[in-house]
Structure formats: C-alpha cells, structure tokens
Amino acid sequence: MPTSNGLRVLVAEDNPINQRVAVAMLRALGHQGVVVSDGEKALRALSQLPFDVVLMDVTMPNCDGMAALAELQERKRQGVRIPPVIMVTAHDLPGDREHFLGAGADGYVAKPMNVAALTAELRRVLGQ
C-alpha cells in the first residue's frame, strides 16, 4: 500500500550512518523510510503500523535480523500480513543470498548499498 509519497519502508538498522544512507536513498527514490535500531523494535513497529517493505540488517543488538525474520515467518504462518523483507548485510559470500532467501527473506542487498541495487531488489520483491 504505497503512500502518496511512494513506498513506506521500515529500515531496521543499528548503525546511524547506514540508517542515514538508507533513508537518503529511499527519499531519492520517492519513498518514506522509518528507522528502528534493532529487531525487537522492528517487530513492534510492524505490529503497530503498515509498511510496504522492510529493509532488515542481519547483525543488530537485542534481536538480530535473522531472529526477527523467524518471528515474522511465524506470524505469517498464523495468518498475519507481513510485508516483503529484504535482508541488508555485509555478508556477501557465495551462498549468502540463498541462505537468507531460504530462511524466508524475500530479497537481499549487500552492503555497501547502492541505489541501483536497492531499486532492482525493491522492484523484484514487489513484482514491478
């Protein structure tokens, strides 16, 4: 459900610099980024507000991206609507994409993110 300003994107990222970069990229693409700093806050935000897509860092304090993804998959099995989740990580070794997709992620973008890769993955996971 895109807003009049594009997509509403939850950015789950603990690094302040990466938060600013992600929000700036989203803004440049005409989207709105809402930032949380860990997986627990991402799960809470997803319970309270509608989002079109989630950019989820893998390594975060309190509740990492993989634990949050597992909880989202459980919610999905219970019939809760979960937006597509794109894992954003510095883990960019052979097999990493398959690992994250196999765990239930809808997409994957390696850090450092660039606008072209983010745009392509947003389009792919949203079927555009």
Region roles according to the model:
Residues 38-41, 64-71:
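Acidic catalytic/metal-coordinating carboxylates
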Residues 13:
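Conserved acidic carboxylate
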Residues 19-28:
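Charged docking surfaces used in two-component/phosphorelay signaling
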Residues 49-55:
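Active-site beta3 strand of CheY-like receiver
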Residues 30-37, 44-45, 109:
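Short hydrophobic/Thr-rich beta-strand motif most characteristic of the beta2 strand and flanking loop
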Residues 61-64, 93:
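The feature encodes the CheY-like receiver
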